[in-house]
Amino acid sequence: RTVKALDGVDLTVLSGETHGILGESGSGKSTLGRVILGFLAPSSGEIRTCGREPNRLKTSDRLDFRKEAQVIHQDSLSALNPRMTLGDSAAEGLRMRNVTRPEALKRVTELFEMVGLPQMLMDRFPNEVSGGQRQRVCIARALTLKPKLLIADEPVTALDVSVQSQILDLFKNLKAELDLAMIFISHDIDVIAEVCDNVSVIRKGAVVEQGVTDEVLTRPKSDYTRNLMASMPGKQWL
């Protein structure tokens, strides 16, 4: 039996907009992110990311594309090289593009300040800082290349609630300051409500509901969305 990981997904995200992808585990959220970034090729349809079709890019063009579209993963510890200092890890994308180490570290210093990290952490290793600090490093690293699109795949799931709030505030500030297009992937309705202008609710790879976040969450039309929201204990969405 053929199973479609994604089926008929239609999604447009503009500069300065944060679009949420909401659904349960296994709904196809992360698969959609991988297709948008060109890590997976769709069997049909068209994907355009920053004006390009990522699955059809020549090898020589992929490095330029990676500059325009960046991803932040859930597990910041796995995302960072344990043998590299945080400063060098954040500067890695610049170094791959022949930026000198002093110039790259200067850019990283500016971004550490932007994401709320002290400069002294640039000489630390990933296992020497907290999970929230590591995630801020990953955000700084994603911003070094001045991307047009940022995809955040469950970026606060592994963090304590108090740290989650700080990271979500950071994402909101960065969107306003940098005019980024952002796709925020999460199973958590509270997270989507906090940071997203619009939302697509996904079930079994298909979009069951899409619209302005406040409207979707306060007046859901889909039974799946209503059930998803009702499953959150202590929440009075409906």
Regions found by a protein language model. Give the residues of each.
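Conserved ABC ATPase "signature" region
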Residues: P102-M120, M229-A230
